Amino acid sequence: MMIAVIPARGGSKRLPKKNILPFAGSPLICHTIALARSLPAIDRVCVSTDDDETARIAREAGAEIVVRPPELATDRSTTASAVGHALLKLAESGPRADVVITLQPNCPLRTAAIVTDAIDLYRREKPDSVMSVTKSQHKLGPIENGRFLPAYRPGMRSQEMPEQYFENGVVYVARADMVTATEDLFGRAIAPLIIDPLYALGDIDTLLDFQVAEFLFTKYVERFVLPTGLAAKGAA
């Protein structure tokens, strides 16, 4: 049993109601729901939320709803705790999940092929989890006592830099029993799914992020699964 959980807390501070803002013609969350429902490998699609309006829109889009308790919907609550709670609640109305796919609704630049590749990688390598990552193009380092400390040799060309990757938030696949037992989405053995930098640009936290993601989604719309029916009407 493979379940997709879409964690959608209602209390975003930087971009209020971001999960249900109109995005390319439909509420943002509906794009993730439509994608998850389009994949034959996924048996159930669930939205975990503490927000009534988000729940209504997600239900109309075809997702099951797990009402998230207030203690799991604070600024300090982890995604893993919400996903673990959702899995336990879903087990009350059906078979326990073997695998959970976590799809964050604020990452709409996600193709069916990316999620399918993540599932295939999980099945093939049998890690604790799969995490989508993207190669970093930046020269990074911390600032301590008002001074920048480069984590590389100053003057080093980009092509000389050791390869490093960052977590992009597009897709996570994990053993469901691990998530419910430990509230950990990753475990020790994390298999990386390397994806194109384009798709990593869709991690929405601010209005600028939203505008950039919507521009790219519209430009490359043929790559994505589009919501239909009631969900699309809800954006009007």
Question: Can you say where each PLM-predicted feature lies in the sequence?
Answer:
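N-terminal glycine-rich phosphate-binding loop and ensuing alpha1 helix
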Residues: M2-S48
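Histidine-centered beta-alpha loop that forms part of the nucleotide-sugar donor binding/catalytic region
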Residues: R9, P70, Q104, T134-K135
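Short, high-confidence coil segments that cap the C-terminus of an alpha-helix
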Residues: I42, P95-A97, K126-P127, Y220
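Short beta-strand scaffold positions
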Residues: V47-T49, V173, I204
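Short phosphate-binding loop-to-helix
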Residues: D52-I101, R110-A113, D117
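Conserved core of the sugar-phosphate nucleotidyltransferase
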Residues: S81, H85, V99, P108-D196
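Hydrophobic helical membrane-anchoring modules
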Residues: I194, Y199-A236
